[in-house]
Amino acid sequence: MPDELRLFLKERFGVQGPLSPGRFEAELAKRLGSPARRAPLLKAWRADLAQGGREAVRSFYREGLNVTKAEALVYGMHHPHLEFYAKELPPRVEGRVLEVGAFTGALVGFLQRKRPDLEWHALDGVEEAVALGKKRVPEVAWHLGWAEEVELPPFDTLLLLSVFPEGLVDQGLESRLAPEAFWKRFAFFERLPLFARLLRPGGLLVYGHGPFLGKSPEGVEEGLRRLGFDRVERVGEGEYFLVLARKPEALAAVRLEEREAPPPEEAEEVAVALEEARALLEAGRYAEALALLPEEAEGEAAYLRGRALFALSRHAEAEEALR
């Protein structure tokens, strides 16, 4: 499967292989020597990293399609996740399938080749990406628009892969977030229902966080359950995971409780304790980390307590802490 995907990406999209996001600017300079030609794309890239938002995302991808070979670099940064998706998705998807944020169609095009028996659709909010996608991957039906707003008949499978966090991530964000921090950071309970409009009741939602910071597979799983999704399951671990779930007839309304902010001195003490607990967990000193985290812990403290309990094989207590 990896070799088949790599050949497809190379032949249709000019992708040479994986590219670390930290190497994007250097690789762009290597492939496009003129500073003047790459300046607009670099400006859009840095704006996307610094401030995010829909317009920053649109600008980056639009400028990327105006620069020769930059499209391939974009796919290079997503390459390892594309390999993971290409391996795990074909046997799981069904019916009419929509990929949200398909860019120029590399993933949806490959999946269509693996499952030609299904009806494949691609959605993107960048007009230039859709126009090029129709040429690159004419085998799928293309739609222009942003998932939160577009009106389309509901699908049997909805793919939210490396798209939900985009535009809401900055370089100061932690790699992993506790569930509540994840819900707040990405406005999960406000935004997810807007995407889920495109999925029929009983249809399959597939969430992949992609190469972005702020991962929380536990947050995705618990968030979907709170919204009423059932048959929630996770595939993969660590950097590479998918969460699959079935949409209910009607989504539940979920509102996070607003907690009163603690006094500055107390907040500082809590922050220090959390930092120490994280360090102890990383060092494998689980019992010591647990001693810093009270049973009534909430938010990130509860998440860290659950991790410590799992590591100590106290699974029932861990599940209670992570609820």
State where each predicted segment sits:
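Class I SAM-dependent methyltransferase Rossmann-like catalytic core
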Residues: 49, 53-88
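Conserved beta-strand signature within the Rossmann-like core of class I S-adenosyl-L-methionine
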Residues: 202-209
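Conserved SAM-binding loop of SAM-dependent methyltransferases across substrates and taxa
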Residues: 104-116
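A short SAM/SAH-binding and catalytic strip from SAM-dependent methyltransferases
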Residues: 157-185
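Conserved SAM/SAH-binding beta-strand->alpha-helix loop
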Residues: 126
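A short glycine-rich, Lys/Arg-flanked "PGG" loop and its adjoining helix->strand segment in the class I
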Residues: 178-201
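A short acidic, Gly/Pro-enriched loop at the edge of an enzyme's catalytic core
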Residues: 150-158
